[in-house]
Amino acid sequence: FDLLIVGAGATGAGVALDGATRGLKVAMVDREDFGGETSSKSTKLIHGGVRYLEKAVKQLDWEQYKMVKEALRERKTFLHIAPYLTSPLPILIPAYSWWLIPYYYAGTFLYDLIAGKQNMGNSYVVSRNKALEAFPMLRAHNLAGGVVYYDGQQNDTRMNIALVLSAIQHGAVAANHCEVVALNKSDKGRIIGARLRDQMTGDEVDIRAKGVVNATGPFCDAIRRMDEPTASEIVSPSSGVHVTFPGYFSPRGMGLLDPATSDGRVIFFLPWQGATIAGTTDVACKVEPHPLPGEKEIEWILDEVRNYLNTDVTVKRSDVLSAWSGLRPLVKDPS
């Protein structure tokens, strides 16, 4: 093979499709289901990152700006090539002080401006009454109004599978439940392939490849240590927990973004397949397969949801229909 890709999540599947469509002979393996870890544990959004844009402006960070611009371009691409898995979603940002309305609108207007031709719809200001009409369960006390902007919503797991199948259609070979147990090297120490183990049968086989791509996300350090046992860790994993509530917690056609949670993060409240998704958290954690959502993180989400819903709406632990945790493969600060 020209390429052996380890990991069949969003990154691995994307690399496989890119390589296969360029005429390369590609093999891709994953020790679990395709997209079974981080890539299926998202907020179900394809977005440029409003909060990253805020950081770019406040910190004059050119790299953050470029990331937002690239993400907005990719958002439009997904909406164009896979309209059956993606769709525009208006998202309301409630404002509980009058001066926050122009502040939020300035940010979303810039977001639209950067998107340019890739924009899905123009942001607009809504009055207090219109905000409550759109989101009846929203806390009305001190509500001044709000701003609505547009982002994309996506079925992450099905998109991952679509990328894998598209890569296979263009000649790639893909196998799930197939684990890399060792990297094979030449006499000169160059990686020339890997030993694979079938997780179902235990059989092992050696695969030769001109290049090996480590696309294992938060698990990448384990693969790196197969090459260099003394390699220092480069991943600082963070847990992102989401919960789902019954569908009546949010309107069908609009999401909500709380830009100022108790600890300064943001939280989304989004309609999803007849239910409502709320999340996410951002907590340092250890790397482990199939992480379980912590009760403390679930309670944090419940508390934040209670903060921006009407006081006559009782949010109980028993309202949680499901919860999941995904690991963000954040890069360690080298300093």
PLM features: residue spans?
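N-terminal Rossmann-like FAD-binding beta1-loop-alpha1 element of flavoenzymes
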Residues: D2-M28
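Glycine-rich FAD pyrophosphate-binding loop
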Residues: A20-S42
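Core beta-strand elements of the Rossmann-like FAD/NAD(P) dinucleotide-binding domain
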Residues: F1, M200-G211
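Short, hydrophobic/aromatic-rich segments at coil-to-beta transitions
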Residues: R190-A194, G253
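Dinucleotide-binding Rossmann-like beta1-alpha1 core, especially the glycine-rich loop
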Residues: K44-A134, I267
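Flavin (FAD/FMN) cofactor-binding and adjacent substrate-gating region
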Residues: I93-H170, A175, K185-R190, Q273
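Conserved SAM/SAH-binding loop
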Residues: H177-V181, Q199-M200
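Active-site substrate-recognition segment that forms the wall
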Residues: D18, V29, V50, Y84-S87, ...
